[in-house]
Amino acid sequence: GMRVIPLIIAEEKLDAAKAAAGEEPLLELRPWVRKTAAIVATGSEVKKGLIQDTFTPVVRDKLAAYGIETLSVTYPGDGVENVANAVAEARQTGAEVILCTGGMSVDPDDNTPGGIKQSGARIVTYGAPVLPGAMFLLGYYDDGTPVMGLPGCVMYAGATIFDLVLPWVAADVPVTRDWIVSLGEGGLCLGCKPCHWPACPFGK
């Protein structure tokens, strides 16, 4: 509603305001739904133990902030088949959100997008007009389970495309390609130090 300033106002003006507002509410609050997640940490170096997995702890913490419990973490290495099989196994755990880390760039051995597609997901977008996070992937399975391919920036940047999408996923609101495209306005993080997100223009 809106406060009417004058003591008296013509009724037709109130009727016009109601008509302009329409039947739908101007704002809708959707609660976060307690969910479970599975993380597929790709990359042969991580699987072989040549480098430490510093990506998973970051993702796990971001999920926990929304009450999302991580059920499993797997290390399939590289290769489209390996990633696809790992995603299929992650789905079998009953996880309601699937997250793949690493292998999202354009290098020849970056096979995560292909693995996600081969696993049967309907790809909503591979790429986003957002920095950090341009190489983000989002898809859905037929049962509504979301799957995301997270670019490396999620590991070290204060706020990324993942931080913009995750609240919607946590509230069970389907994320569309049109909405991802709309993030192009306000989609450049200025990298402020210290980071004040979400109290900043990023993603708004």
Task: Kindly label every feature range from the protein language model.
Residues 1-71, 75:
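Short, glycine/charged-enriched hinge/interface segments at domain edges or termini
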Residues 44, 50, 54, 68-203:
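Short glycine/threonine-rich loop/turn motifs
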